[in-house]
Regions:
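Active-site SXXK
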Residues: 48-61
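Short amphipathic alpha-helices in soluble, non-transmembrane regions
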Residues: 105-110, 208-214, 326-332
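Non-catalytic beta-strand/loop surface segments
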Residues: 1-39, 63-99, 137-192, 216-262, ...
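Short, polar/flexible loop-turn hinges at active-site or ligand-entry regions and domain interfaces
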Residues: 59-63, 112-121, 342-343
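Short pre-active-site segment immediately N-terminal to the catalytic Zn-binding motif
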Residues: 38-46
C-alpha cells in the first residue's frame, strides 16, 4: 500500500517550484531549498565551486550581515545547515512554525542578493575555511581520502563523478571573484531550485509566503545541462594500494551501478544490503562472527541520477589478520551471490530494513522535507515518497541476482586498500593504481 502524506505543488512565475506538505502534529516547520547544482555540474577548472558556495551562502547578502543568517535563525529556535553532493546543493532549517517568514526571507535574500557580499575578502576567507576542512576531513583523517581515491579510479578525473565535492585546491586557489560570481549567476536562481515547506502551516499560507518572498526574484538564463555520465560496469579491476599510519588495515571496493530511479538500481542496492547491511548480512556472519578476520563490514548503494550510481563494500581487518584473506572472503561472497542468488528470507529482511529506514526518515518534518526536495528536484515527482516502499518491495530475488551478476562482480570493481607499514609484506599487495 502506498503512503498518503499530503503533497501540493505550485510553480511561481519565475520558475521556482514550491512543494508543501502540511503536518499539524507539532508546531514545527521545516524549510528546504535545493539547487540543481552539485559537483557533477562543475566544468574542469571549477571543481569545488558548489561546495564553496555552501560556505559563502552564510557570509551575508544585501540585507544580512556576515554570520547573521545563523544568528537570526538560532535566536528563533532553529537548527540549520547545508550540504553539497554530486547531484545537488541543499540549504535547510527546522524551527518553530512562527519563524517561517524569517526563514523564507533569509533564503530569498541570499538567492537574490548574495553577490552583494561576495567580495575578495569573503572569497579569501572561505577559501581558507574549505582548505582547512579538506585537511581535517580528507588529508589528516584515517581513510579520509578513500572515496577521493575510489571515484578517481572508478570513473576517471574527466567523468562528472570523477571528483569529490570538496574539489581541487588548485582550482580554488585560481578562482577569481569574477569566476565565482559567474558560477552563481549560472546556477543559483529560482528556476533552478525547489523550495519545500513541511509542517505546521496551511497549504495556501505556505504558497502565499513563498510567493511573497521569492516571487520578485528574476529567473536566470537556462543553466547548462550537466554532462551525461552514462557508463556501464567497470571493466577489470582498478586498484590503489596505500601504506600509511592508519588504525587498522582496511579494504574498500566500489562498483558502478545503474542510475537512480530504475528497478535495476533498486535490485543492485538490495544485493549490496544482503551482503553487508546489518548483523545478519552475509559478510558480517562470515568475516566478523565465523572467521573473525574483520572487526566490521559495511556497504551499500549511493544512488545518483547522472547516468550511473555506485556502491561500496568495506572490511576493516582485525589486528594480525591478512588483508588478502579479507579481500578473498569478500570476493567469494560477491561471486556466490551472483551465481547462486539470494533466498526469499534474505530478500524479505533487506526489504523490511529499507521500509523501516524510509518510514523513520519521513516521520520528521525535516526528513520529509529532504525527501520531497530530493524527488522534486531530481525526478520532478515529489509524490514518489509515497510510492517508494512499494517500489522496493516489487523487486524480486531473481532481479537481485541479475543485477549482482551484471554490476556487483569481483572482476568489475575499483579497490583501495590501506595497510599499516608494519603489516606490509612483499607477498601482499602491489602498490599503485592499475587502470
Amino acid at each position: 500500500m502506498p503512503l498518503n502524506y499530503p503533497i501540493a505543488e505550485q510553480t511561481l512565475d519565475n520558475g521556482l517550484r514550491v512543494v508543501v506538505s502540511p503536518d499539524r502534529g507539532v508546531p514545527i516547520v521545516a524549510v528546504n531549498l535545493w539547487y540543481d547544482v552539485g559537483s557533477r555540474h562543475e566544468p574542469p577548472g571549477l571543481t569545488g565551486f558548489a561546495h564553496l558556495f555552501e560556505h559563502l551562502m552564510f557570509q551575508g547578502s544585501r540585507n544580512v550581515r556576515s554570520g547573521e543568517h545563523f544568528a537570526l535563525l538560532e535566536q528563533a529556535g532553529a537548527s540549520l545547515n547545508a550540504s553539497t553532493f554530486f547531484d545537488r546543493t541543499n540549504y535547510y532549517e527546522s524551527l518553530p512554525s512562527g519563524g517561517l517568514d524569517l526563514a523564507l526571507w533569509l533564503e530569498a535574500d541570499r538567492m537574490a542578493y548574495l553577490l552583494d557580499a561576495v567580495n575578495q575578502e569573503n572569497l579569501d576567507n572561505q577559501r581558507d575555511v574549505v582548505k582547512e576542512e579538506k585537511r581535517q576531513s580528507y588529508d589528516n583523517r584515517p581513510y579520509g581520502d578513500s572515496y577521493e581515491r575510489l571515484v578517481t579510479i572508478a570513473f576517471g578525473e574527466n567523468h562528472p563523478y570523477g571528483h569529490m565535492t570538496i574539489g581541487s585546491m588548485a582550482d580554488l586557489d585560481a578562482a577569481t571573484v569574477e569566476d565565482v560570481h559567474a558560477f552563481f549567476r549560472k546556477h543559483y536562481g529560482p528556476n533552478n531550485a525547489v523550495l519545500t515547506i513541511v509542517g505546521d502551516v496551511a497549504e495556501e499560507d505556505a504558497f502565499m509566503a513563498a510567493k511573497r518572498y521569492f516571487g520578485h526574484i528574476p529567473a536566470i538564463p537556462q543553466p547548462p545541462a550537466a554532462p551525461d555520465g552514462s557508463v556501464g560496469p567497470i571493466t577489470g579491476v582498478a586498484r590503489d594500494d596505500v601504506v600509511e599510519d592508519v588504525p587498522s588495515d582496511l579494504i574498500t571496493m566500489m562498483f558502478r551501478l545503474p542510475a537512480d530511479g530504475t528497478p535495476e538500481l533498486d535490485a543492485a542496492a538490495l544485493a549490496l544490503d544482503v551482503l553487508a547491511a546489518g548483523q545478519s548480512s552475509r559478510l558480517n556472519r562470515r568475516l566478523v562472527r565465523e572467521e573473525q578476520i574483520a572487526q566490521s563490514v559495511s556497504g551499500g548503494a549511493l544512488p545518483l541520477v547522472g547516468g550511473v550510481s555506485f556502491g561500496t563494500l568495506t572490511g576493516v581487518a582485525v589486528d594480525g589478520a591478512d588483508l588478502r584473506r579479507v579481500e578473498d572472503s569478500i570476493l567469494e561472497e560477491v561471486e556466490k551471490l551472483a551465481t547462486d542468488g539470494i533466498t526469499e528470507d534474505e530478500l524479505g529482511t533487506v526489504q523490511a530494513q529499507n521500509e523501516r529506514d524510509w518510514l523513520e526518515q519521513l516521520a520528521t518534518c525535516a526528513g520529509r522535507a529532504d525527501e520531497l526536495s530530493h524527488n522534486a528536484l531530481l525526478f520532478g515527482d515529489p509524490g514518489r515518497i509515497n510510492r517508494r516502499i512499494d517500489e522496493v518491495h516489487a523487486v524480486t530475488a531473481e532481479q537481485v541476482q541479475q543485477a549482482a551478476a551484471e554490476w556487483v562482480r569481483a572482476d568489475r570493481r575499483a579497490q583501495v586498500t590501506y595497510r599499516r607499514a608494519e603489516s606490509t609484506s612483499s607477498a601482499s599487495f602491489m602498490s599503485g593504481a592499475q587502470l
